[in-house]
Every structure is written in structure tokens, then in C-alpha cells.
């Protein structure tokens, strides 16, 4: 596992955006051989999307031959709802780049058969071989995507019941009213994430510090699904200084020295 300990959330957004651009450009995608990118929603990746849009507008990257798969979607929320993840992705990213609509893959939380929808999603991912880079965030309780504590580390795309803690955290997007937050979501599984060629997780803020500690210094534990990154041969965690508050000083210093060359020019 790589840990990139940066100063603040703005730096996390810039570093992660540059990393995605480097991976896409090095891959040299074509229509027949697209770059497959996994994407999250939430407040943490907003800086990354902002930077990616800026880099695209500067002519330094194209998304014409990029295929995307999003991590999750609420069940029962209309696609047009302002807090649906469909709306989030189009408003904050897709509407501002040159990606082809047919290359955008999002789970349908209103599918008449959600189990069939989850199987379809897994099959669509498999049809591309693998996801080249899956970017994600993490919850305060260490969940990645909507793989809540005690999720199987071998899980695939499925419907999940959201914990009260997650619904309380997400109520800030629903005028602070937890009753408006859906109780269920469709989500890729931990196993789905681990199948990706590379996984990059963004961790910002003191509230995520226990989750980061579990990921980096803890043991692999299904109560902290982020800890499954330890099983991945090519995982990278990009964090800010407040998120490192529960890590040992020597741990942070070790990774800071190790990644010094990769943290220049921010």
C-alpha cells in the first residue's frame, strides 16, 4: 500500500487528479481499448473533479475513450433528484468534459429487479476485462462505497441497508433531515473493488482519522472495510494532515520520506 500524506484537501484533489491524468495518458486509450475508470460521489472527490475539469480545459487530457463505472446509487431516488448520484456526477463532472454518454455507467436504483441490475453491472464491468483505476472515498466508520461495517470482503455488487451513522452523515445533503435519506443503496462490493488494477482512496478531515488508522496500521477486518486495501497489490491512499491524527508519527514520516519525490510541485 502507498500512502500519500499531503497538507490539505486541496492538495489531495490536485494530486489525485494528476494521478488519474497520468494513468489515462500513459494508457493511450482508443475506442477499441478504452481506459476504464471507477468513480465515487460525496464531498471528498469534489476537489478532484474540479481539478480534472481544469486539466481537461487546458487540453492536457481527453475523456473520449474513457469508460466510467460509478460505485453506488441510492435505491428509490429518481435519477432527476438533485441528490441522486446520477445528478451529482453530471452536475459536478460529466457535463464539463468530453466523455461519451454511452461510456458512462451508473447503477439504476429504480430498476424493477435490483438483483438483476447488480448482476448486469458486474457483467458489464467484466466485459471490459477489469477497471484500470478505481477512485473512492471512505466513511467515518471505514466503509468504502456503501460496504458498511461487517460487509464481506469478497462481496460483489448488491443492495445494502445503510447504517444510521451513514444516513446521519448523508443527511447534510437532505437539509439535515434523516427521514429523507434513502435506507437502501446499490453498491459495488469490496471484491469488485479489489478486482481493479489499481485502487485509489481519498481520505480528508479529522473525522476520517480512525478509518485511516484502521486502513494503514490495523489488521484486515470486515468491520473496517477500507482495511481490505491491504490485500490489494496496487492500492494508494491520498490523505490530508488532519486525517493522519490517529496514525503514529513514525508511520507518517516513513511514508512522507518514501513518497517525497511524488509530492513535489503541489
From Swiss-Prot:
The yes or no answer to whether the keyword Lipid metabolism is present is: no
How is the quaternary structure described?
A: Homohexamer.
**Inhibition and activation profile:** Allosterically activated by N-acetylglucosamine 6-phosphate (GlcNAc6P).
Keywords from the named record: Allosteric enzyme, Carbohydrate metabolism, Hydrolase
User: Is Isomerase tagged as a keyword?
Assistant: no
Cellular component terms (Gene Ontology): cytoplasm
Gene Ontology terms: biological process: carbohydrate metabolic process; glucosamine catabolic process; N-acetylglucosamine catabolic process; N-acetylneuraminate catabolic process
Which catalytic reaction applies to this protein?
alpha-D-glucosamine 6-phosphate + H2O = beta-D-fructose 6-phosphate + NH4(+)
Q: Where is this site: Part of the allosteric site?
A: 151, 158, 160-161, 254
Xref: InterPro entries: Glc/Gal-6P_isomerase, Glucosamine6P_isomerase, Glucosamine6P_isomerase_CS, NagB/RpiA_transferase-like
Query: Its Gene Ontology molecular function terms?
Result: glucosamine-6-phosphate deaminase activity; identical protein binding
Q: What is its EC number?
A: 3.5.99.6
Q: What does this protein do?
A: Catalyzes the reversible isomerization-deamination of glucosamine 6-phosphate (GlcN6P) to form fructose 6-phosphate (Fru6P) and ammonium ion.
Q: Please identify the protein, giving its name as recorded.
A: Glucosamine-6-phosphate deaminase
Pathway listed for it? Answer: Amino-sugar metabolism; N-acetylneuraminate degradation; D-fructose 6-phosphate from N-acetylneuraminate: step 5/5
Protein family per UniProt: Belongs to the glucosamine/galactosamine-6-phosphate isomerase family. NagB subfamily.
Which Pfam family would be a valid example here? Glucosamine_iso
Record's Gene3D superfamilies?
3.40.50.1360
What positions does UniProt annotate as the active site of this protein? Answer: 72, 141, 143, 148
Amino acid at each position: 500500500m502507498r500512502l500519500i500524506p499531503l497538507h490539505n484537501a486541496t492538495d489531495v484533489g490536485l494530486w489525485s487528479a494528476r494521478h488519474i491524468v497520468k494513468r489515462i495518458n500513459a494508457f493511450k486509450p482508443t475506442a477499441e481499448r478504452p481506459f476504464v475508470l471507477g468513480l465515487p460521489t460525496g464531498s471528498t472527490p469534489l476537489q478532484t473533479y474540479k481539478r480534472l475539469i481544469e486539466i481537461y480545459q487546458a487540453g492536457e487530457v481527453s475523456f473520449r475513450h474513457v469508460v466510467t463505472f460509478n460505485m453506488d446509487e441510492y435505491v428509490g431516488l429518481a435519477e432527476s433528484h438533485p441528490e441522486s448520484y446520477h445528478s451529482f456526477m453530471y452536475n459536478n463532472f460529466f457535463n464539463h468534459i468530453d466523455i461519451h454518454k454511452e461510456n458512462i455507467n451508473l447503477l439504476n436504483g429504480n430498476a424493477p429487479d435490483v438483483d438483476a441490475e447488480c448482476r448486469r453491472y458486474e457483467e458489464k464491468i467484466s466485459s471490459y476485462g477489469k477497471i484500470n483505476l478505481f477512485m473512492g472515498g471512505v466513511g467515518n466508520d471505514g466503509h468504502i462505497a456503501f460496504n458498511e461495517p461487517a460487509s464481506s470482503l469478497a462481496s460483489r455488487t448488491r443492495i445494502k441497508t445503510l447504517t444510521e451513522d451513514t444516513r446521519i452523515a448523508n443527511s447534510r445533503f437532505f437539509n439535515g433531515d434523516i427521514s429523507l435519506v434513502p435506507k437502501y443503496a446499490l453498491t459495488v462490493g469490496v471484491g469488485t473493488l479489489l478486482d481493479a488494477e489499481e485502487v485509489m482512496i481519498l481520505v480528508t478531515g479529522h473525522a476520517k482519522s480512525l478509518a485511516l488508522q484502521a486502513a494503514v496500521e490495523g489488521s484486515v477486518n470486515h468491520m473496517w472495510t477500507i482495511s481490505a486495501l491491504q490485500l490489494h497489490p496496487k492500492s494508494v491512499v491520498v490523505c490530508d494532515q488532519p486525517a493522519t491524527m490517529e496514525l503514529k508519527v513514525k508511520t507518517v514520516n516513513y511514508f512522507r520520506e518514501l513518497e517525497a519525490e511524488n509530492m513535489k510541485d503541489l
